[in-house]
């Protein structure tokens, strides 16, 4: 029976007889004495096999190879002074092996090195194909251990300090798509009908508030059939919370204390509170994004009114058509950014155009403080306009001013993308910084020009600001998102709890009475039975862990993730199923493989 984990052993255990289980991380033969680094999920410890002390264990050690699974019994000994390893938590001790038992061998060539001593850069597709080996490596082991610590800290805070209870909600539920597509599951028992996998437990947690469970939480599995990015997965985990009888300020305060508890427990970091706040309008105006990265400056400056009447039609035309002209000032940009990079073919130009912009105009502030302009801007920018631009941007000599002009949406998206690109490229971001902030006062709805209707900016169960009830198309939502280093890690709101307001919101977003009843009739009915005021929030657990571990991809915060093509390279899911299975479900596939053209 195991007595200790490998990473637990310290000088206090010297003289103790121990039994360890683990994998051979590395084997070294030094002049007749064999050293083995034995690894389990807690760390590694050095095993010594000396032929003069235990010939039998030495013979067994000779047959060991990397990643063999072994059981080792021996005695803890202090290392000689010259062999101490301060980089290793177990570096003061070693185990003299009395007996080594091989439990399983490696019978195929390893696709990559697992050993922490020889950790190499491995292609991600290979890591995902052999994920069980990748998870043995230090990096992924640390990530999953930290993920566990985060969940443990969440449970301890919510249950022990705030009287929340954990309740599971259904995974097979009704399809009520809003935004992303649902994953659908055919019902064999009810032919022709379908379940959906939940995009969130939103409706059920609101029903739990109706039921009187006034403080609910769940570590919930959620599913969205959407195009994937580096920080998204088709199935993901979220911390889901809902509370009755709390104001928005009380919910924000509770969540700040929760986040501070997680960071203190997991990373030993004291977060200053309260967290900064921006309104949605402020965030979009200054950063072009509702999830701004505030670890660096480079704030946008709106000069639409300054250039509205100038002869340069790109600027004046954008303003006349209801758009914006904004400037992204780059201090010391004259020395660091060449014209070539801003013009067609340049990397900065590419960032802007990939976000929808036609291009970027620019001017430079020379060392004498004068604006140096080129082309059409030079011919149409008056001295008064130049002076006002300098005043608003507070541009110092050497500053590069990048202009975005067009629809408000494209200007914000393109300058936000350029800002993020330059923040990294110019080394303006402190990689150790952790900048948290709340974004509040979101619009209730936004106009979808393609579908010619309003859509809920968050979801249609978000409560409008009581001051804005007269016109829901211009109303502010009682919503709040929490942002960490430019990524939204959580979003929530106070909820609608009165049937008449909920029906008005459905009508505003184009749901007929019949559609609303068919999709959400059960919720509307519940509102007739004494629903308390309530609100909540949901955190993307995978994304939070990604940020806490310093990883670039959410896949490195998940044990068995999918690729950006929504595939599992380990199990080869999704995969074909038999005609018999489809027949049992009364389902037929209409998909046809594309016809290859002949040469």
From Swiss-Prot:
Give the SUPFAM superfamilies listed for this entry: Class II aaRS and biotin synthetases (SSF55681), GAD domain-like (SSF55261), Nucleic acid-binding proteins (SSF50249)
Which Gene Ontology molecular-function terms are recorded? aspartate-tRNA ligase activity; aspartate-tRNA(Asn) ligase activity; ATP binding; nucleic acid binding
One GO biological process term is:
aspartyl-tRNA aminoacylation
Compartment(s) where it occurs, according to its Swiss-Prot or TrEMBL record: Cytoplasm
InterPro entries for this protein: Aa-tRNA-synt_II, aa-tRNA-synth_II, aa-tRNA-synth_II/BPL/LPL, Asp-tRNA-ligase_1, Asp-tRNA-ligase_1_N, Asp/Asn-tRNA-synth_IIb, AspRS_core, GAD-like_sf
Q: Where does L-aspartate bind?
A: 178, 224, 458, 495
Annotated spans, Aspartate: 202-205
Q: What keywords are annotated for this sequence in UniProt? A: Aminoacyl-tRNA synthetase, ATP-binding, Cytoplasm, Ligase, Nucleotide-binding, Protein biosynthesis
User: What is the catalytic activity of this protein?
Assistant: tRNA(Asx) + L-aspartate + ATP = L-aspartyl-tRNA(Asx) + AMP + diphosphate
Q: What is its main location?
A: cytoplasm
Look up the domain of life of the source.
Answer: Bacteria
Binding of ATP: at which residues?
A: 224-226, 233, 488, 540-543
Q: According to the UniProt entry, what is the EC number of this protein? A: 6.1.1.23
- One Gene Ontology cellular component: cytoplasm
Site Important for tRNA non-discrimination: list residues: 30
Q: Give the main EC class.
A: ligase
A Pfam family hit: GAD
What is the role of the protein in this entry? Aspartyl-tRNA synthetase with relaxed tRNA specificity since it is able to aspartylate not only its cognate tRNA(Asp) but also tRNA(Asn). Reaction proceeds in two steps: L-aspartate is first activated by ATP to form Asp-AMP and then transferred to the acceptor end of tRNA(Asp/Asn).
Q: Which NCBIfam families match?
A: aspS_bact, PRK00476.1
Assembly and interaction partners:
Homodimer.
What family is it from? Belongs to the class-II aminoacyl-tRNA synthetase family. Type 1 subfamily.
What is this protein identified as? Aspartate--tRNA(Asp/Asn) ligase
Q: What organism, scientifically named, is this protein from?
A: Synechococcus sp. (strain ATCC 27144 / PCC 6301 / SAUG 1402/1)
Tell me the lineage of the source organism.
Bacteria, Bacillati, Cyanobacteriota, Cyanophyceae, Synechococcales
Q: Which gene encodes it?
A: aspS
């Amino acid at each position: 029976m195991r007595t200790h984990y490998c990473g637990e052993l310290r000088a206090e255990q010297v003289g103790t007889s121990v039994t360890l289980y683990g994998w051979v991380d590395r084997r070294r033969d030094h002049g007749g004495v064999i050293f083995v680094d034995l690894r389990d999920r807690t760390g590694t410890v050095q095993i010594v096999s000396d032929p003069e002390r235990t010939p039998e264990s030495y013979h067994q050690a000779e047959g060991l190879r990397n990643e063999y699974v072994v059981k080792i019994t021996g005695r803890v000994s202090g290392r000689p002074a010259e062999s101490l390893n301060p980089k290793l938590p177990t570096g003061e001790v070693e185990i003299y092996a009395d007996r080594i038992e091989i439990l399983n061998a490696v019978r195929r060539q390893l696709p990559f090195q697992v050993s922490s001593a020889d950790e190499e850069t491995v292609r991600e597709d290979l890591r995902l194909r052999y994920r069980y080996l990748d998870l043995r490596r230090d990096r992924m082991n640390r990530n999953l251990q930290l993920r566990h610590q985060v969940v443990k800290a969440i449970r301890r805070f919510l249950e022990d300090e705030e009287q929340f209870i954990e309740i599971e909600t259904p995974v097979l539920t009704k399809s009520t798509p809003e935004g992303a597509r649902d994953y659908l599951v055919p019902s064999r028992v009810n032919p022709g009908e379908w379940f959906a996998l939940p995009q969130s437990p939103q409706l059920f947690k609101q029903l739990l508030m109706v039921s009187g469970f006034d403080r609910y939480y769940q570590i919930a599995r959620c599913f969205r059939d959407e195009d994937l990015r580096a920080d998204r997965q088709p199935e993901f985990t979220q911390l889901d919370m809902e509370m009755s009888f709390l104001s928005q300020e009380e919910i924000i305060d509770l969540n700040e204390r929760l986040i501070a508890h997680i960071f203190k427990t997991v990373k030993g970091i004291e977060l200053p509170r309260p967290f900064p706040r921006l309104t949605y309008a402020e965030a979009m105006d200054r950063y072009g994004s509702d999830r701004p990265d505030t670890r660096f400056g480079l704030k946008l400056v709106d000069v639409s009114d300054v250039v509205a009447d100038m002869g340069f039609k790109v600027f004046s035309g954008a303003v006349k058509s209801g758009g914006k002209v904004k400037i992204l000032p780059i201090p010391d940009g004259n020395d660091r950014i060449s014209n070539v990079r801003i013009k067609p073919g340049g990397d900065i130009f590419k960032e802007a155009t990939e976000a929808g912009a036609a291009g970027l105009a620019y001017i430079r502030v020379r060392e004498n403080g004068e604006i140096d302009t080129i082309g059409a801007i030079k011919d149409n920018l008056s001295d008064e306009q130049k002076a006002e631009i300098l005043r608003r941007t507070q541009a110092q000599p050497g500053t590069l001013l990048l202009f975005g002009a067009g629809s408000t949406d494209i200007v914000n998206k393109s300058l936000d993308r350029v800002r993020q690109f330059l923040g990294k490229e110019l080394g303006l971001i402190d990689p150790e910084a952790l900048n948290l902030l709340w974004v509040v006062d979101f619009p209730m709805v936004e106009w979808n020009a393609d579908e010619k209707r309003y859509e809920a900016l968050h979801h249609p169960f978000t409560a409008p600001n009581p001051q804005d009830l007269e016109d829901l198309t211009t109303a502010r939502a009682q919503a709040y998102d929490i942002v960490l280093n430019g990524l939204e890690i959580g979003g929530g709101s106070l909820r609608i709890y009165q049937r008449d307001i909920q029906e008005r919101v459905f009508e505003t977003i184009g749901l007929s009475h019949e559609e609303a009843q068919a999709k959400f009739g059960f919720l509307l009915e519940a509102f007739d039975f004494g629903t308390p005021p309530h609100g909540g929030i949901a955190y993307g657990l995978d994304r939070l862990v990604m940020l806490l571990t310093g990883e670039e991809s959410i896949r490195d915060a998940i044990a068995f993730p999918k690729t950006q093509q929504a595939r599992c390279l380990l199990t080869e899911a999704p995969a074909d199923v038999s005609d018999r299975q489809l027949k049992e479900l009364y389902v037929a596939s209409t998909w046809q493989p594309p016809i290859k053209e002949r040469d």
